[in-house]
């Protein structure tokens, strides 16, 4: 976790010039022009951290957790790249947002970058879960958990720091529920990166974009798949399906603002928050 935090802080500093390029510029919720897609650093941090830990483990003649870390960081890399595509090439009309928007575009003969992200994310989830789970039931449930977790994180990424905070809380719950299962080591690297990127996100120095939200959600979904029993995974899937369906009709931001405890937590640490 700490390694992820440190590497994220270093990577943000070293790549500041990269994200000043026009292709990464977008407007945030205040209408300010800032860098978007900085969340693509999450898989970079994860890969570097996993590489360093693998070398350390080899020196210590320890092999535990190497495969779990590799699966998580490579999956996160795939989801982040799909999100980055939407960040830099999908600055289209609001009508194309959400499942219904992408479906309308597809019916009219247009394949949006958001649709590419959803289809690609679903396929990636099937491939990854297929390597972990042998049965059909496990495959369908777990692939849906990973893909919908990534999309749910995207739905939450509508205000500075919101997605990062929810990621930290969700990981803490998962960590406690699984009694600090060692298979969460790879997910912990991603969460460490989330901690390192949170201050800049809250201060509106940059936006994570779909690249970051996708990465966070996919990592958490994969963490559930790797550590929880079938009943728990089905329960998580039901919640994720419900959130995705509700999002088509209700604004999460409005719901959060209308609920004092959630509003306080959502605005905690944010620039200009009441």
Where are these regions (language model features)?
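"…together with the soluble PPM/PP2C metallo-phosphatase catalytic core" -> "…together
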Residues: 1-254
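Short, highly charged, low-complexity non-transmembrane loops/tails of multi-pass membrane proteins
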Residues: 254-274
């Amino acid at each position: 976790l700490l390694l992820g935090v440190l590497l994220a802080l270093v990577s943000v500093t070293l790549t500041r010039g990269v994200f000043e390029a026009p292709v990464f510029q977008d407007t945030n919720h205040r209408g300010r022009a800032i860098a978007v897609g900085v969340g693509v650093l999450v898989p970079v941090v994860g890969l570097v951290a996993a590489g360093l830990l693998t070398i350390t483990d080899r020196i210590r003649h320890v092999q535990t957790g190497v495969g779990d870390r590799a699966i998580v960081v490579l999956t996160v890399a795939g989801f982040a790249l799909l999100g980055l595509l939407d960040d830099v090439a999908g600055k289209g009309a609001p009508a194309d947002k959400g499942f219904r928007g992408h479906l309308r575009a597809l019916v009219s003969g247009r394949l949006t970058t958001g649709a590419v992200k959803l289809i690609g994310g679903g396929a990636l989830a099937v491939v990854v879960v297929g390597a972990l789970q042998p049965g059909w039931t496990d495959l369908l449930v777990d692939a849906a958990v990973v893909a919908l977790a990534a999309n749910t994180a995207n739905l939450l990424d509508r205000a500075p720091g919101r997605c990062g905070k929810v990621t930290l809380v969700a990981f803490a719950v998962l960590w406690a529920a699984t009694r600090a299962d060692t298979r969460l080591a790879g997910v912990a690297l991603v969460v460490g990166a989330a901690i390192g990127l949170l201050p800049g996100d809250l201060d509106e120095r940059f936006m994570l974009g779909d690249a970051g939200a996708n990465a966070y959600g996919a990592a958490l979904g994969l963490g559930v798949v790797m550590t929880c029993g079938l009943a728990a995974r089905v329960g998580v899937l039901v919640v994720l399906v419900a959130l995705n369906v509700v999002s088509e009709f209700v604004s999460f931001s409005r719901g959060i603002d209308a609920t004092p405890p959630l509003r306080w937590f959502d605005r905690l640490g944010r620039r200009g928050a009441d």
